[in-house]
A protein has these predicted regions:
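Glycine-rich beta-strand-turn "strand-cap" elements at beta-sheet edges
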Residues: 2, 40-49, 76-107
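Short, well-ordered beta-strand segments in beta-rich or mixed alpha/beta enzyme
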Residues: 2-9, 38-67
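Generic alpha-helical hydrophobic packing signal
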Residues: 3-5, 15-17, 77
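Short, surface-exposed ligand-recognition loops at beta-strand->loop->(often short) alpha-helix junctions
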Residues: 9-22
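Intrinsically disordered, low-complexity acidic/polar segments
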Residues: 15-17, 50, 62-64, 97-100
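Short intrinsically disordered coil segments
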Residues: 23, 71, 103-107
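An amphipathic, aromatic/His-enriched active-site/gating alpha helix that lines ligand/cofactor pockets
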Residues: 24-25, 29-37, 56-90
């Protein structure tokens, strides 16, 4: 399993609007993507204009396809609500109780 994280800082007072946009526009797009598994959106309790979206993918290739084919349009959709460009990072999932993945142990 593979993840993409997208860290954002919204313009003042735009966090709720971004959350609504993600729920109404972004999630339906994600759900149609090959290999998409799940999306978790976190909002900072101390900095309410900061958020982190974590998407889970079956494979790195699925996430890369989404990044190339769909993410540019989504980035344009959310850009007016942001203070800065989103920061995208990718990770292999090592352990997850939700997705029933356990770290492999060396023999």
């Amino acid at each position: 399993m593979f993840t993409r994280t997208v860290e954002v800082t919204t313009k003042s007072g735009k966090a709720q609007e971004l959350t609504t946009l993600i729920n109404d526009k972004v999630l339906p797009i994600l759900k149609k993507q090959t290999g998409f598994v799940d999306e978790t959106v976190l909002v900072s309790d101390t900095e309410p204009n900061r958020g982190l979206a974590i998407s889970f993918w079956n494979t790195k290739q699925d996430a890369e396809r989404y990044q190339k084919e769909q993410y540019p349009a989504i980035q344009e959709m959310i850009r007016p609500l942001l203070d800065a460009e989103p920061v995208v990072r990718t990770f292999n999932v090592d352990t997850s109780t939700t997705h029933k993945i356990a770290a492999t142990k060396a023999a």
